[in-house]
Curated annotation (Swiss-Prot):
Keywords per UniProt: Amino-acid biosynthesis, Branched-chain amino acid biosynthesis, Leucine biosynthesis, Lyase
EC number: 4.2.1.33
Function: Catalyzes the isomerization between 2-isopropylmalate and 3-isopropylmalate, via the formation of 2-isopropylmaleate.
Coiled coil: none
Protein name, UniProt field: 3-isopropylmalate dehydratase small subunit
Class of this enzyme: lyase
Gene3D superfamilies associated with the record: Aconitase, domain 4
One GO MF term attached to the UniProt entry: 3-isopropylmalate dehydratase activity
Claim: Lyase is one of the keywords in the record: yes
Catalytic activity: (2R,3S)-3-isopropylmalate = (2S)-2-isopropylmalate
Entry's family note: Belongs to the LeuD family. LeuD type 2 subfamily.
UniProt lineage: Archaea, Thermoproteota, Thermoprotei, Thermoproteales, Thermoproteaceae
GO annotation terms (biological process): L-leucine biosynthetic process
Length: 162
């Protein structure tokens, strides 16, 4: 499972309140949530997110448990999130909504804003097409990969009995 897009780079400890502020949790439409993704940190994020790979530092998605954070990023058009580490609940929520995630050590030191990236979730690597550098990460395996390939948990469960 591969995706390709331009990098949008942020730092460490981006919490779910930054990814989607609480005042927008009344909405369920992914497109509406996407219009407000990352609003406190980067009001221009929705304009640059479509077809992008979000790159972040440590503890991405920490804070309160809200699946709307992953839905908002997907609704904004983010193709994948690559981070040095993830809060476990965000990581699982992303997989459950069909948003590819990959953990890659030191990725924020090796990727710049606007770099063209290819992310291979199953292979567990990121290829920086701008620099030619390949960064090894932690590949998804087993059930999490199957859920992601199905497009999320709901789709996975719909097809599991077949």
């Amino acid at each position: 499972m591969k995706v390709r897009g331009k990098a949008i780079v942020y730092g460490d400890k981006i919490d779910t309140d930054v990814i989607i502020p609480a005042k927008y949790l009344v909405y369920t439409d992914p497109a509406v949530l996407g219009q407000h993704a990352m609003e406190p940190l980067d009001p221009e994020f929705p304009k640059k997110a479509k077809g992008a790979v979000l790159v972040a530092g440590r503890a991405f998605g920490m804070g309160s448990s809200r699946e709307q954070a992953a839905i908002a990023l997907k609704g904004a058009g983010v193709l994948a999130v690559v981070a040095e580490s993830f809060a476990r609940i965000f990581f699982r929520n992303a997989i459950n909504v069909g948003l590819p995630v990959l953990q890659v050590p030191d990725v924020t030191k090796r990727v710049r804003e606007g770099d063209e990236l290819e992310v291979d979730i199953e292979g567990g690597y990121l290829l920086n097409l701008t620099t030619g550098e390949r960064l090894e990460g932690k590949p998804l395996r087993g059930l999490p990969l199957a859920i992601l390939k199905a497009g999320g948990l709901v789709n996975f469960l719909k097809t599991a009995g077949r």
